[in-house]
Amino acid sequence: MGSAPDNDSTPLDGDFEREVYEALKLWKIPGIAIAVIDEESTWTEGYGIADLASSTKVEANTLFYGGSTTKAFTAALMSMLVEDNDRYPHVQWSTPVCELIRDDFVLGHPGRTADTTIEDILSHRTGMPGHDFSMGSVHAGQQATVQDVVRSLRFLPAAAPPRTTYIYNNAMYIVASHLIQTVTGEELRSLFQRYIWDPLGMSHTYLRLKDAVAGQEPLAKGYADESATDDDPQYEEVPWKDRPEISGAGAIISSVGDYAKWVHALMNPEASSSSSSSSDSTATTSLSAAICADVGTARTLIPPPSEPFLTPMAYCLGWNRYVYRGVEILTHDGGIDGFGAEIAMIPALKYGVVTMANSTYTSNFGGTCLVYKLIDDKLGIPAEDRYDWTQKYTDLVAQMDAYNANAVSYFYPTLPDPPRPGPTLPLAAYAGLYWHDGYGALELVLDAADGKLHATRTQAQYTTACALTFEHISGDFFTATVAVVGAQTVVPAEFALSPAGVPRAIGIGWEPHLGTEKRTWMRRVGADEAGRLLRGDQSHPHHAEAYVSYQREEAQLPEFLTSHLFV
């Protein structure tokens, strides 16, 4: 079911509906909601199933997680602070982040800490990789906060100098969330509500799961396809995420109807700033033309150029920007376990498309295909000249499968022939608890059934839950298959032994941006120390202290013995 203006020119017609259901079948997506904004007209429609157990259908007002589409709201709110020189003159794009949250924002080197600006963290040019597996949902036995995530960055390495390359980083938008809350003294969701959602009439948009569940509109269930073939899907329900620590990086829950109001406002900023669709007469939005232009201005080049775009993509502030078929487009996607969202808008034509769906990863594949079907329709692109988005994502899935299948040769191109027959010690000797101050705990267990080492990081403990299965390759070198919801990847792993022949550390290639040779070294800890660390009894050195500690440990100890040194 859906809603539309009273005219016959709907782009969501019967022909398009057939394409939607073909996409749902191909990409194994239970359901999807779509909105189209064309100047002053908006059409919304739901297709498929929101809840398989109850056979509840997707409606135009069904709620979905929006994932990283949250970032555009965070960037817009930050831009409002930058523009408000009366109350926040100390908040400018060039302001170093450490000047505003000095005790919390510390990177691995004092120069990097001092040099990283607000603009840098919002445009993915800090040189820091994502380190997504490092984020814990629990800190010292309590629900992790944005401050906890920010304070963990001091233990994580950079991949490039600042402002030299684009590296997408969720954690930096968590930094932005913490900065905004610290400067204003208010929760991010309250600020979103007052300055964006209420003025635009976005009455079904939330930043907390409990608020969405308590609302009037149904929240779709998320799913992952667990079938091993391309045949009928075997959907497994994915629990709703309650992750306040991801905040302005990806916690939003909304509907395509509300997002249509957001997209319309971004393309018509003066209208949105001079009037409000909220019944609250005190609700005003600061979404000015200057702010909309600011967040949509290219800041960081995203290499390399990619077909079918005419120009290299660039990252703005919460948006990607590029030229497609002769028009400039702003886009962003969002993905979170069980859900995926796509937003695209052509400001010059005041045309936008939003999709929200309830499958892991494939929501974005299918959503993108449908977004560009609608854009091509709007631009009048002949069928024979249209780019094959379905083939693009089919090839991408094949590339991911090939990468996993050939991981051993990729990570270990100089293996001896034949490989060394076994690790130095019996596998049981490597089992135990390992710790890294940024990545937390990893407990290795030997499974008697398959004779392999395994580790599990649950959703109750970590923002990104995963299960690791270790395969011996040669000597003390392994690969680890890292299974997450709806997908898996392979990373290198190796053990370091003490002179006495005791396992002292495990090095894992958690972060691909650091290169194939670098490992995150997690040191082995005993039960007493593990308990202390899990209670949060560890120091959080300022950058100067961290730098001295780094240099001292590097000079005096083997690198694998340090808790925050990466090699």
From Swiss-Prot:
Its EC number is 3.4.-.-. Pfam families: Beta-lactamase, DUF3471. It is an enzyme of class 3 (hydrolase). One of its GO terms (molecular function) is hydrolase activity. InterPro entries: Bact_CellWall_Synth/Modif, Beta-lactam-related, Beta-lactam/transpept-like, Peptidase_S12_Pab87-rel_C. Pathway: Secondary metabolite biosynthesis. Keywords: Hydrolase. Gene3D superfamilies: 2.40.128.600, DD-peptidase/beta-lactamase superfamily. Disruption phenotype: Does not affect the production of unguisin A and B. Belongs to the peptidase S12 family. Hydrolase; part of the gene cluster that mediates the biosynthesis of the unguisins, gamma-aminobutyric acid (GABA)-containing fungal cyclic heptapeptides with the amino acid sequence cyclo-(D-Ala1-D-Val2-L-Phe3-D-Val4-D-Ala5-D-Trp6-GABA7) for unguisin A and cyclo-(D-Ala1-D-Val2-L-Leu3-D-Val4-D-Ala5-D-Trp6-GABA7) for unguisin B. Within the pathway, the hydrolase ungD catalyzes the hydrolysis between the D-tryptophan and GABA residues of unguisins A and B to produce the corresponding linear peptides. This is Unguisins hydrolase ungD. It comes from Aspergillus violaceofuscus (strain CBS 115571).
